[in-house]
Amino acid sequence: MWDQTTGITYSDKEINSILEDYRNGAVKTLPARDVTGHGNEVAVIACGRSGVASDADIIIVKLGNSGGNAYIRTTQIMKGVDYCIRKAIEYSQPVAVNISYGGTYGNHEGSSIFEMFIDDCCSTYRCSICIGVGNEGEGRTHYSGQLVSGNVLDEELAIGDYEPQISIQIWKRAMDNARIELIAPTGERLVISERNAGVVHHNIKNMRIVSKAYGPGPFYMGEEIYAAIVATSGYITSGIWDIRFTAANVLDGFFNMWLPPVSTLSSATGFLRPSPEYTFTIPGTSRRAICVGANGRAPGSAATFSGRGVNVKSGLLLYAKPDITAPGVNIRIPGNKEKTVTGTSFATPMVTGAAAMLMEWGIVKGNDQYMYGEKLKACLLYTSDAADDKA
């Protein structure tokens, strides 16, 4: 186990010795603990005594930093994945990596360094990386629109009471020229799309609005407009905020907007006309990873909260996600009859465990040395049940 919060790596012998001393009362506190229980629950489903791959060897990475910041950086996840693969190479074993984590920041097209890193890892070694697509399906945190030259498009954003801050990301093609305004419930209008203006600060009552327009970069030919509304005291103004697009010359016109994850927002906060089609979370947008959604209660149905979407480029369908779904509603944790969990975080380890067992059958037992990567994904999809198209 590698604990990123302390930088300490524990061998299996050290872990067993520490746990034995703890059970015997020789030590009062454990040097590493899963405070939320999320990681333990995921691990138990994937490879616990009653889990899917109960005989698997386990590599654990506790994400985080010594400062105790609750927000995980993408670089920490990348280092964790790299650690798992390097350990697997060291022990000459295939590895199934579980990532029950996702965020909404990014263009969701698989073109970020984070997503491309995951794809490269899937092609580098005998591994399978399984990632949850998130629980944003019903969250009202995404909107897709189409700009038309000379037209005005308004999308309304409801902000509930007691929101201390919120951010809005808009991703569009750089060749599409449009003036974008943020209009407060009290009528103040702010332009947030000025190119080459750097970071722009606005002040409205007790709020500070920070915006910046980012042009194309080495890995993305589009443009990002980012705006953050932060209360300097109390909370930001609740009510209906308007995001207005006044289009000039438009060649493509397609754009997306995302808010922070639904779990961080008030239930009253969200777009009034949300689009559920691009609600998968990053890195569940990775193209070569096995991206996992959650089944609903009805046979063959997807859970309504489960994220979904396609990687698109100029309106062309490239990859549809999730690749596969697994049970993710009211899942009983093995060994804990009282506890149930819901979400794609807990559907994902079921697929990770299945991937580990397929690699054991193929690689470890000598039945198929190429049972990893895209071939393993194809085997899972081929043997799965077809989903209901109406789900």
For every predicted segment, state its role.
Residues 105-115, 132, 136-173, 177-181, ...:
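Active-site-adjacent substrate-recognition loops and nearby beta-strands
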Residues 43-46, 59-67, 85-93, 177-179, ...:
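Hydrolase catalytic cores
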Residues 1-75, 92, 126, 164, ...:
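Subtilisin-like serine protease catalytic core
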Residues 85-108, 132-133:
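Short acidic, glycine-rich surface-loop motifs adjacent to enzyme active sites
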Residues 79-83:
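Short, well-ordered amphipathic alpha-helical segments that serve as non-catalytic structural scaffolds
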Residues 113-126:
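Catalytic-core regions built around general acid/base machinery
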Residues 385-391:
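A short, hydrophobic C-terminal helix/tail in secreted or cell-surface proteins
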Residues 1-40, 91, 186-241, 245-260:
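Active-site core segment of subtilase-fold serine proteases
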